[in-house]
Structures are given as C-alpha cells and as structure tokens.
Swiss-Prot record:
Species for this entry: Oryza sativa subsp. japonica (Rice)
Signal sequence coordinates: 1-28
Example of a GO biological process term: protein folding
Protein name, UniProt field: Protein disulfide isomerase-like 5-3
Thioredoxin domain location: 29-153
Source species, domain of life: Eukaryota
Pfam families from the UniProt entry: Thioredoxin, Thioredoxin_6
Residues at the site labelled Lowers pKa of C-terminal Cys of active site: R139
Sequence similarity: Belongs to the protein disulfide isomerase family.
Molecular function (Gene Ontology), one example: protein disulfide isomerase activity
Amino acid sequence: MGKPTLPPVVVVVVLLLLVVVLPATTCGADAGGGGEAEEFQIPRDGRVLELDDGNFDAAVRAAGLLFVDFYAPWCGHCKRLAPQLDEAAPVLAGLSTPIVVAKVNADKYKKLGSKYGVDGFPTLMLFDHGTPTEYTGSRKADLLVENLKKLVAPDVSVLESDSAIKSFVEDAGMGFPLFLGFGVDESLIVEYGAKYKNRAWFSVAKDFSEDMMVFYDFDKVPALVSVNPKYREQSIFYGPFDDGAFLEDFIRNSLLPLVVPMNRETVKMLNDDGRKVVLMILQDDESDENSPRLIKVLRSAASANRDLVFGYVGVNQWEEFTETFDVKSSELPTMIVWDKKEEYEIVEGSERLEEGDYGSQISRFLEGYRAGRTIKKKVGDRSPTLLGVNAVYILVFLVAVLVLLMYFSGQGEEDQRPRQRAHED
C-alpha cells in the first residue's frame, strides 16, 4: 500500500495557519507577552555596559548617546583599550548631556558586527540617537572624553549671558581652541563651526557685559576672539566678516598655536593645513638652556609670517622624526622648510644657527627662503657616508619580513580572524 497523502486543500490551510500564527508567536515572545519591546534600563553608576544581540537595539533606543566598543576577546589592542574605557565611562556619564559607554563581543555576535560594518578590532562607534558614526580619534581616556564632548556639542553654541560664557569656556576644557563671537551673527560662522567641528569650539555671545570686553581684551564689536587655552594664546578678528576668505584664514590659522611643538599628535593636526612648515630642529627642546630663547624668537617670526606654520622639535624628544631630515648633531640648532610630504628645503648660508643674534639669523633664513636660495631634499634621504650602514639595516629588515611571512603562512585559525586595529596615540 502507498503512504497516505493529505488532500491539497488541507495542505493549503496548514500553510496559511503557519504564516499567520508563527509571526504572532514570535512577536509575543520578543515583547514578553505584552506586545511592546522591553525597555532597556541605563545604569546610573557610569560603568561600561556589556551588550549582546538581544539587548543592543534597546540600549541604542534608551541612550540618546551611546559609545560602543566592538571588540574581540583575543585582540591585544582591545585589552589595552578596556581600562581606558573604564576610566572614561563615569566621566562621560556625568556630563550635562550624558554619553553611555558600552561594549559588544563582535567576534561572538558576528551578525551584529557585520550590520555596522565591523571588519577589525577594536571598532569604536558613537550612536547619536540611533545614527552611528565611527570614531577614529585618540583612545587615551582624557583625550577620548574631550573628543566625544566635542562631537556631541552643537556646531555653534548661542550664549545669552556672562555666566553662560564662563560655563561654555569651563566645559570646553583645554583640549581644543575656542572661538567666541561677540556681537557676531551666528549665520556668519555656522559654516565654519560645522567644517571645523572636530578641531575647535564655536560660540556667539548675544548678551555680555563690559567685564567680558575687558577680560578678552577687545574694544569694539563685532569681534571674533580666538583662545587656545592649552598654549595660553589669544587673538582677535574684527573683520571683514562679509569676506569669507579673510574669516576662514583667521579661523584656520588659529587652530594651531603660533609655534607648534612637534609630536605625534600635533603632526596629525598639520594635515588639513595647506601651509608649509618652518621647522627648527634642536638637540633638546626641554633641557637646552638656549631653547627658550630660540623658541621666543621663533614666535616673533611666526607672528609676522602667518603664511607659514612655525614649529620646533628636539632630537632627544623625537629622534625617529628628526633623522628623516638628515641632520647632524654638529649642525644643531638648524632650520628647514618642510612641505609635510616628501620634500624639505635648506637655505644656503643658513645651515646652522650660531649662538648670538638669533633674530637676525632667522630673518636671513626667511629672506633666503622667499628669494629661492634653497636646496631641495627628499625626506628620508641619507648622506653617502651612511649608505653602507643603511644597506645592513635594509638586509636585516628584509630577512625579518621573510621570517614573519613564513610564520604567518602557517597560521590557520588566526588568519581567519578579522584584523586588529592598531592605533597610535
């Protein structure tokens, strides 16, 4: 006998029941039987939350601002980041506009990571009322707090009183330059507030007293005051405000200190600045007794030559950077003009700054540069006397690369893991 079969009509009825009943059952389970998604409770103690694919969406809805670390347990960079997030989380939770910090094991919850384009660890994202933006700034706790405060702030803050101005400056902290527009219409700077949002604070003061005019040292309005609290610098722009080129030049120039101390963080800040860099290279920019005097003279030159960026660096402080300019200790202190890419120029007759009248020597250097009396060199070039040594270094490097390639070619599971995201603060 053949196996009994169901009539076609019965099959159709069963399928219809499955289509109608199963979705309703599933929704009821997700909603806890009440027909509504369970509300996520944000803890008030400022700890880092551990989220998963079951509560992530609810957490995004509950927290207006949610900063998420998509991590993997085996990732070394993630392990080093964890204590920084633990330190930053209570500070961010205590802001006037709180930011909740959370983490997700994206190696375990791969679909959740894939949904937000996570292809390496750690991946950091800020969810602003549900809208994700990848964060690529510093991962040190204090700088992380400053950067996130800046990201969630309005492009231009409107201040209605002296107390509001003081609170704005205090809340901004020391991490970024500030622009305070006294008697300046918001519409005149809102474009730049958006354009340079990640690099400075912008505000307009609609009501203020004469005390503010005295404190910020301006005597008429409209006036745009630039304050760089980290370097204790201040400058004032009185206009013209109807010419965007002049206004943006002032803003762009004020994003950097008058003389930039070169380090890994400040070099990154130069990327968006189109000016070349007049770089003074010292043996030691901290302990050398002549360094303060040299930097003071360099500051005077910088204020008179705003079409150039001026900076200084000590060999003892950052040898890896200074050696790319092929300078010798016997030639220090020296000056070059660097294009921030592949070339730099030395000025003929100004190869070394001799002790004495530094002001005149720096003036002659700038005159020689503007007159074109320069020799162009490639960044990373070495003198002929170092070719033999470099050849040895290159050989050692190639052997090391070969060994690494052989090692990683034998890895199985490890190669299948998403890459770790290195980040240099």
